[in-house]
């Protein structure tokens, strides 16, 4: 259990100022709070200087606590590196963050906001986060952690992307408007039950195949007791299910309301068509990230495609752990692996050994909760390699810097920049600023 292996410290920090979309909050100046958990290994003795600080990101609507068994496995199996701490924050509209912000949230969501929120979190706790930092993200969290690396290219030593939502086109059975798809299910699903036990039974399909440790956390953190702002009248809900008013069972709902899960999965584009003329025109104030060529579609999600298109520039090394039975477009993800880090500003990519893919056959998108040990083992092999490289690079940097002046430039500057000839006439710059 995580509490046996880690000291868990909770934090509440402000989110980034000015959200990507004006409709993300009730009022545009609202200050959102981000709920953070810091997992510090219980250990004897000092922490090594090169111990890793992990920054982790979760999937849509998935409580951050579901990943705790993965942290346990990383700690148990760690060889060739040490863990300083693991930091994980709920997206502002989800889970514990969502509860803190529920009076300020509205019906829009940009994945880019959480990348900025994490950058502010890291800056806030910088004294506890010396290098190396490693990013690990699952699903849309893999997209978010990649965008954080775009924001600050030298922040992460390496990235671990677990079935990341980075692709050019929507997945089949994923984001189409016709059923079956994830968004149809999200909008039309039941989201209130007479008791936690009934809720667990009703959602057993989602929990199928989960590691018992993850299943335990799912039952605790995926549901929330009523009342909530969405369902304030507990007695009315009890009456709906025929439960007596004096019953001791408490109705529950989803910790992340289904509407916030929906708008994180997909974004509406309902107003691009002028009702009078029928003309399609992108409303730039609110939908500047909409591709004008497809502005006629009513729903879209910009981040998977925009993130894919920047993969060539990704600076940190990167391990892609891909679920062989994922519902995502696996062929497109693998195309992303091929170009990852290969361009100007990038890591060097696959040819330089800086990017690697591992496909886990038969594993589904929820593999961090179903195949915890295998996912951890896959990450550890990569981390051993990357930490060896980090230490070598650090040693070389210190050797190269030894004895250098920090007050004046080195001699090579004088060799490259030629001196101004003596006796040269002074330029007449009168009249110029």
Swiss-Prot record:
Q: In which pathway does it act?
A: Secondary metabolite biosynthesis; terpenoid biosynthesis
Which EC number(s) does UniProt give? Answer: 3.1.1.-
Protein keywords: Hydrolase, Peroxisome
Knockout phenotype, as recorded, reads: Retains the ability to produce MPA, albeit with an about 50% lower yield, and accumulates 2 compounds (MFDHMP-d4 and MFDHMP-d5) with an even shorter isoprenyl chain than MPA.
Please report a single Pfam family linked to this protein: Abhydrolase_6
Identify the enzyme class: hydrolase
Q: Name one GO cellular component term.
A: peroxisomal matrix
Q: Which GO terms describe its biological process?
A: mycophenolic acid biosynthetic process; terpenoid biosynthetic process
Q: Does the keyword Disulfide bond apply?
A: no
Active-site residues per Swiss-Prot or TrEMBL entry = 139 (nucleophile), 163, 365
Recorded catalytic activity of this chain's protein: mycophenolyl-CoA + H2O = mycophenolate + CoA + H(+)
Residue span of region Abhydrolase domain: 58-246
MF terms in GO: fatty acyl-CoA hydrolase activity; hydrolase activity; polyketide synthase activity
UniProt binding sites for substrate:
60, 140
Please state where this protein is localized. Answer: Peroxisome matrix
What outcome is documented for mutating residue 139 to A in this protein?
A: Abolishes the acyl-CoA thioesterase activity
Give the protein's biological function.
Type I acyl-CoA thioesterase; part of the gene cluster that mediates the biosynthesis of mycophenolic acid (MPA), the first isolated antibiotic natural product in the world obtained from a culture of Penicillium brevicompactum in 1893. MpaH' acts as a peroxisomal acyl-CoA hydrolase that converts MPA-CoA into the final product MPA. The first step of the pathway is the synthesis of 5-methylorsellinic acid (5MOA) by the cytosolic polyketide synthase mpaC.
Similarity remark:
Belongs to the AB hydrolase superfamily. MpaH hydrolase family.
- Summarize the subunit comment: Homodimer.
What is this protein called in UniProt? Type I acyl-CoA thioesterase mpaH'
- Source species, please? Penicillium brevicompactum
Gene designation per UniProt: mpaH'
């Amino acid at each position: 259990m995580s509490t046996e292996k880690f000291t868990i410290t909770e934090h509440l920090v402000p989110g980034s100022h000015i959200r990507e979309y004006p409709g993300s909050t009730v009022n545009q100046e609202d200050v959102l709070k981000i709920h953070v958990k810091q997992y510090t290994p219980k250990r004897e003795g000092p922490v090594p200087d090169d111990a890793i600080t992990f920054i982790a990101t979760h999937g849509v609507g998935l409580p951050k606590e579901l990943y705790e068994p993965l942290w346990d496995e990383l700690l148990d199996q760690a060889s060739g590196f040490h863990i300083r701490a693991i930091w994980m924050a709920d997206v502002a509209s989800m889970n514990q963050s969502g509860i803190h912000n529920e009076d300020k949230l509205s019906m829009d969501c940009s994945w880019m906001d959480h990348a900025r929120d994490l950058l502010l979190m890291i800056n806030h706790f910088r004294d506890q986060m010396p290098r190396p930092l490693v990013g690990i993200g699952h699903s849309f969290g893999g997209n978010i952690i990649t965008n954080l690396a775009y924001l600050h290219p030298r922040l992460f030593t390496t990235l671990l992307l677990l079935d990341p939502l980075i692709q050019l086109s929507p997945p089949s059975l994923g984001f189409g408007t016709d059923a079956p798809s994830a968004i149809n299910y999200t909008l039309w699903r039941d989201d209130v039950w007479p008791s936690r036990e009934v809720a667990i039974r009703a959602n057993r399909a989602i929990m199928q195949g989960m590691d018992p440790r993850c299943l335990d956390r799912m039952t605790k953190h995926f549901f929330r007791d009523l009342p909530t702002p969405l369902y304030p009248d507990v007695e009315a809900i009890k009456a709906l299910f025929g439960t007596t008013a004096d019953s001791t069972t408490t109705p529950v709902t989803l910790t992340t309301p289904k509407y916030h899960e929906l708008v994180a999965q997909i974004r509406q584009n309902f107003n691009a068509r002028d009702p009078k003329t029928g003309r399609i025109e992108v409303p730039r104030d609110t939908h500047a990230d909409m591709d004008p060529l497809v502005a006629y579609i009513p729903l879209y999600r910009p981040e998977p495609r925009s993130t894919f298109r920047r993969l060539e520039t990704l600076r940190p090394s990167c391990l892609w752990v891909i679920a062989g039975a994922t519902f995502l477009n696996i062929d497109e993800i693998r195309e992303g692996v091929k170009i990852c880090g290969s361009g100007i500003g990038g890591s060097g990519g696959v040819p330089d050994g800086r990017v690697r893919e591992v496909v886990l056959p038969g594993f589904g998108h929820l593999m961090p909760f179903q195949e915890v040990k295998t996912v951890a083992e896959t990450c550890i092999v990569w981390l051993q390699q990357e930490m060896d490289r980090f230490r070598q690079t650090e040693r070389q940097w210190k050797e190269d810097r030894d004895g250098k002046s920090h007050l004046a430039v080195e001699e090579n500057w004088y060799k490259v920049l030629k001196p101004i000839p003596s006796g040269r006439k002074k330029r007449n710059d009168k009249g110029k600023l």
